Regions:
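A general structural signal for stabilizing positions within well-ordered secondary structure
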Residues: 10, 54-55, 87
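Lipolytic serine-hydrolase domain surface
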Residues: 53, 68-71
Length: 134
């Protein structure tokens, strides 16, 4: 979402029209401060380059950020903090919280046009089907 498509690949800078970000790590500093730093050998440069939250000036498409309420507190915090930072940068962002979903169940909702993320993806593309009648 923060790639310079024109410079790096010769593609239109607005080639991506939107994105759905799920259960992500948007600032990698906490990883380096955790026990994981023993096996995840990030350098300062890698941390900077891979921390999306530090490149919001390059974000040029609306995004949807999501997480499930049964995910780890760190995934939830990262999503909330990232959404707040995107809003503060004046960029379009929406937060979707999957009540009762864990890290592995959230992606499963993409496969159904009425599922939490499937519907969000279709709505973002302006292709959402009508809600089923009860």
């Amino acid at each position: 979402m923060v790639t310079d498509w024109k410079k790096d690949f010769g593609l239109p800078s607005d080639i991506l029209k939107g994105g759905l970000l799920m259960s992500g790590m948007y600032d990698l500093k906490p990883v380096r401060l955790s026990k994981r730093s023993e096996y995840v050998k990030f350098t300062d440069e890698m941390e900077q380059a891979l921390s999306t939250q530090r490149h919001l000036d390059k974000l040029n498409a609306p995004i949807i950020v999501s997480y499930g309420t049964l995910e780890s507190p760190e995934f939830q915090r990262q999503a909330r903090d990232f959404v707040a930072a995107v809003k503060a940068a004046g960029k379009p962002v929406q937060l979707i919280v999957g009540e009762g979903y864990n890290h592995f169940e959230m992606p499963e909702t993409f496969g159904n046009p009425y599922g939490l993320m499937g519907r969000a993806a279709l709505e973002q593309m302006k292709l959402a089907p009508a809600q089923p009648q009860s």
